[in-house]
């Protein structure tokens, strides 16, 4: 996929982050030795295919300028463990659509990919966005 992705990361140095990192880097690779392990940080992809031209030359300034839903906390409920054949979705924790996660992803999609088209971003969120956290 061309472009950048925006990720939501669990708070660093928390039991959740530490447990997810251990699952990704140690526990699951030791149980599925026939599958090549990939080391990555725990994250939920909010949107992908953000053109580099939008955030060049200062990605942090672009991120700081995003108009995002006002919320101090995003909650994510695990609704299923979902195996798949796709490389980036070999084993995921499927997340629910509540707790502000979809609203955040919708705002990121509208501003990062759809040139501010909020209606298009809402349609994308309803029809295409599947919040998940990859484990393998």
Language-model features: locations:
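Basic, often amphipathic N-terminal segments
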Residues: 1-77, 98-136
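Glycine-rich beta-strand-turn "strand-cap" elements at beta-sheet edges
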Residues: 77-87
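Short, low-order "capping/linker" segments at domain edges
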Residues: 87-97
